[in-house]
Curated annotation (Swiss-Prot):
Pfam name, any one: Ribosomal_S8e
Lineage of origin: Archaea, Methanobacteriati, Methanobacteriota, Thermococci, Thermococcales
Coiled-coil features, chain-numbered ranges: none
Protein's UniProt keywords contain Nucleotidyltransferase: no
Matching InterPro entries: Ribosomal_eS8 (IPR001047), Ribosomal_eS8_CS (IPR018283), Ribosomal_protein_eS8_arc (IPR020919), Ribosomal_Se8/biogenesis_NSA2 (IPR022309)
Molecular function in Gene Ontology: structural constituent of ribosome
Chain's gene name: rps8e
Name under which the protein is recorded: Small ribosomal subunit protein eS8
Organism: Thermococcus gammatolerans (strain DSM 15229 / JCM 11827 / EJ3)
UniProt xrefs under HAMAP family: Ribosomal_eS8
Family: Belongs to the eukaryotic ribosomal protein eS8 family.
GO biological-process terms attached to the record: translation
Complex formation: Part of the 30S ribosomal subunit.
């Protein structure tokens, strides 16, 4: 069944709202990309969006652009340590904005939206030695 992002057909009281028009194609939504950590190679999907534009969805990510002090490096993603969007996402290795990922050079926080941008950008976390 399609995901519809139009107005709800229920009133706050629970009563029904009768639409004065049909549902429009522009009101359709899509399933989330749920970008995972790749095993061997990255996988992208190009989708058509409203107005004929294109959006690149990152389905499987192998590398991340990690920035530290203005310098960026392309490093391999090892796994997802924590994900504040959903605690099950860390277990399933799903990357979203705000997720903490383990890379070759240390832990980093994802600053991009991989399902919308098609790339994983992250900022390196400072390791605290206590």
């Amino acid at each position: 069944m399609a995901i519809w992002q139009g107005r709800s057909l229920k009133k706050p009281s629970g009563g029904r709202i009768v639409l004065a028009r049909k549902k429009r194609k522009r009101e359709l939504g899509r399933e989330p990309a749920n970008t995972r950590v790749a095993e061997e190679r990255e996988k992208r999907k190009i989708i058509r969006t409203y107005g004929g534009n294109r959006k690149v969805r990152l389905v499987e990510a192998l590398y991340a652009n990690v920035f530290e002090g203005g310098k960026g490096r392309k490093v391999k993603i090892l796994n997802v340590v924590e994900n504040p969007a959903n605690r099950q996402y860390a277990r399933r290795n799903i990357i979203t904005k705000g997720a903490i990922i383990e890379t070759e050079i240390g832990k980093a926080v994802v600053t991009s939206r991989p399902g919308q941008d098609g790339v994983v950008n992250a900022v390196l976390l400072k390791e605290e030695n206590a």
